[in-house]
């Protein structure tokens, strides 16, 4: 606040919201795991915010680093459909993972996506991975491929 007061022109007596926004950084770092959580919970707003953040930082978040995490999440979701008991503990024991992982990602994913949709999502992730490596895609940038994939997953 002291720095804002010092930077304030002599003719002004009040600090405005625009001056505060201009003097601080309003960006937030996101992780691939937050992105995975947003997709599993089908949180369209958060998934799109994170996707735009990744698109604006392609060197720090290349598509080839994002896709394996998303693939693993949806592959685990597909496997969970075959668990003999569809409870939190039943799925956790059957898959050999912690129950908090089931509670955080698997159960919301099972509520939001059918088994057929998950198979289609896995296919779309594999297709996006191939396209990011130049197969059937000579020039589409990674950010555009990610946008297409996220739209397919969420809609």
Short names for language-model regions:
Residues 139-155:
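Acidic, carboxylate-rich catalytic segments that either coordinate divalent cations
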């Amino acid at each position: 606040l002291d720095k804002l007061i010092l930077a304030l022109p002599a003719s002004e007596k009040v600090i405005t919201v625009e001056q505060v926004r201009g003097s601080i950084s309003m960006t937030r770092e996101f992780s691939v795991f937050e992105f995975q959580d947003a997709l599993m919970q089908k949180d369209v707003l958060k998934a799109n915010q994170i996707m735009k953040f990744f698109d604006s930082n392609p060197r720090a978040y290349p598509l080839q680093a994002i896709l394996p995490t998303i693939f693993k999440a949806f592959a685990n979701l597909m496997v969970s459909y075959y668990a003999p008991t569809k409870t939190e503990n039943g799925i956790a024991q059957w898959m050999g993972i912690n129950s908090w992982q089931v509670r955080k990602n698997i159960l919301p994913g099972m509520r939001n996506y059918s088994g057929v949709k998950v198979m289609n999502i896995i296919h779309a992730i594999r297709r996006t991975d191939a396209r990011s490596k130049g197969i059937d895609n000579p020039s589409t940038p990674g950010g555009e491929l990610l946008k297409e994939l996220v739209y397919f997953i969420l809609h």
